[in-house]
Amino acid sequence: MQIILLEKVTNLGNLGDIVRVKDGFARNFLIPQRKARRATEAAIADFAVRRAELEKLAAEKLAAAEAVGIKLKDMVLEIGQKAGVDGRLFGSVTNHDIADALKAKGFTIEKSSVRLPTGPLKMAGDHPVAVAVHTDVVADITIRVVGEQA
């Protein structure tokens, strides 16, 4: 299916690009989240009219994301989890737990934006984590997992 992108999408293209994607990806992800539209003649003409408005909106989103990225930069987030004597956690700290902790601090971050380089955190201590606030803004934070005695 050919679609026209209404915003920048990672590994796909920028605002206004006409790209071919699999039907399921377009129908189930891009179109419902208003990241793209089908590339019909009417949609392309409508996009040409609204392009300046969409570019302004994209610039505002980027500016807001950069402001959040500056606040998040070099942040140390402390998460408590039950652990054994050797520091191994009972369970793990996932991207969902980190997103919830960030929401408690006042940030609106989705769990899919939290990138754990080595998978879920299973040891107490400091762990570097990347948070993708926007496709162009990635903030590096440190997660300090504090082991609580069970």
From Swiss-Prot:
Which GO molecular function annotation, any one, does this entry have? structural constituent of ribosome
Q: Name one Pfam family in it.
A: Ribosomal_L9_C
Q: Which UniProt keywords apply?
A: Ribonucleoprotein, Ribosomal protein, RNA-binding, rRNA-binding
Q: Which domain of life is it from?
A: Bacteria
Biological role: Binds to the 23S rRNA.
Q: Which HAMAP family match?
A: Ribosomal_bL9
> What family is it from?
Belongs to the bacterial ribosomal protein bL9 family.
Name of the protein described by the UniProt record: Large ribosomal subunit protein bL9
Q: Which organism is it from?
A: Polynucleobacter necessarius subsp. necessarius (strain STIR1)
Q: What is the lineage of its organism?
A: Bacteria, Pseudomonadati, Pseudomonadota, Betaproteobacteria, Burkholderiales
